[in-house]
A protein has these predicted regions:
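Short-chain dehydrogenase/reductase
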Residues: 1
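ATP-dependent carboxylate-amine ligase
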Residues: 7-170
């Protein structure tokens, strides 16, 4: 988002716009649902980043969650279209949890089992919850989340995680 704002600023300046006019435009931007959309309700903060996922974006989202206030909960699902190394790439994302201070992982999906196992090995500070399906995950997640928590929800779109965000925002 920052790089997009910088690129937009450069284009605006190239076309003779005033910096104050560009600033107003940038300040009025709102993130799209599923694309690092931050939702704050009376209970907790949800980072809705479940439109798509790949190893780089997963790691970046985990880094953002690590810097968030309160108890940090990562709700992650499978990453699609990774090819023959998909299991290793999921495990690599799990290894990224080491030293991040993430309190809990709720993972669902066949490939995310690799991610959950890697978190269990690399991050003793993270409570790991693995489920085969998104529905099983939601059943355990909803009563787990408390006031003041920050919850990252991220998976490839085919996993249907917007439903998780919808349940959390009820």
């Amino acid at each position: 988002m920052v790089y997009n704002a910088l690129a937009g600023t450069a284009v605006g300046l190239a076309y003779g716009m005033e910096l104050s006019e560009i600033q107003k435009g940038i300040e009025s931007l709102q993130s799209l649902s599923g694309r690092f959309h931050i939702i704050e309700n009376e209970k907790y903060t949800i980072v809705d980043d479940c439109y798509n996922a790949n190893p780089v974006s997963m790691k970046a989202s985990i880094d953002v969650l690590a810097a968030a206030p309160g108890r940090k909960i990562a709700v992650l699902g499978d990453m699609g279209e990774l090819g023959e190394n998909e299991q290793e790439l999921h495990a690599m994302v799990g290894e990224h949890f080491e030293g991040k201070g993430i309190d809990a992982l709720f993972a669902a999906g066949a490939l995310s089992e690799n991610l959950a196992q890697a978190v269990g090995k690399c991050s003793k500070e993270t409570e790991v919850h693995y489920f085969k399906t998104k529905d099983e995950l939601m059943e355990e997640l909803l009563p787990y989340v408390k006031s003041g928590d920050t919850v990252l929800v991220k998976a490839s779109h085919f996993m249907g995680f917007p439903e998780v965000v919808g349940q959390l925002t009820k």
